[in-house]
Amino acid sequence: MTCTIHGQSSQHKENQLPDWAFGGFERPKNVNPVISPIENTKFYCPLTKDSIAWESNDTFNPAATLYNGEIVVLYRAEDKSGVGIGHRTSRLGYATSTDGTHFKREKAPVFYPDTDSQKELEWPGGCEDPRVAVTEDGLYVMMYTQWNRHIPRLAVATSRNLKEWTKHGPAFAKAYDGKFFNLGCKSGSILTEVVKGKQLIKKINGKYFMYWGEEHVFAATSDDLINWTPIVNIDGSLKKLFSPRDGYFDSHLTECGPPAIYTPKGIVLLYNGKNLSLIHISEPTRPY
């Protein structure tokens, strides 16, 4: 049996962390942003058959990991093919750093929609929002969103060097005879553990474990890190582990972030909490 621990403190206790929490984060001064859009990096898109300024509009929602002693950041980049996030094409860029603040970037994306088996699910919206974790034997597993501008699907890819990737398709394609294939889903956080200074993918009771979801937090298990089975209730509906809370910073959505971490005090999951734009009628200063 596993449990997820997440913060419940209100805005009045925002600096008081429980003893299980990770805290003390600080924003380095005068270094941000560390990766920004660039107009002059071109990429020949195999689908449009044209040279694209692939990272000219946005660079955001990155994943970070270690490879050969360097920090590697895989970041989502959007071109200027449309207006508004999600209406352009996303590809994943590759950047390295030895200090965490100064980065060297590849000129071409390392992961993108192509003339492959995933084209129908990734074009024209692209490949979005990577989360990366690694096994003890050095296999990098990336959860990302396939976006064809109809249904966002949580998908899996693997690599040994973070540049050459094998796409495995939607994470839930085979679960329950394909019941969740057309489910809109994203944001997969695979469970990890810090072992001798390395953050590695961990099994629970012989299975890999993943938290996922954008509006609510759900969970899934896997035997091979490729095919995932969502955890469901007795009636077959998805089991919600936690959801948005009225009157808090996460009143609109609770979206899984980087890989969850198993600790002696429980599993720590960092998530993106977004509040509604409404104002509580009895407290005009509090978002609801």
Question: What are these language model-derived features?
Answer:
Residues 10-65, 101-133, 163-202, 228-262:
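Surface loop/turn signatures of beta-propeller and other carbohydrate-active proteins
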Residues 62-84, 128-149, 187-220, 260-261, ...:
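Hydrophobic core segments of beta-strands in well-ordered, beta-rich domains
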Residues 279-288:
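Single conserved hydrophobic/aromatic residue that forms the stacking wall/gate
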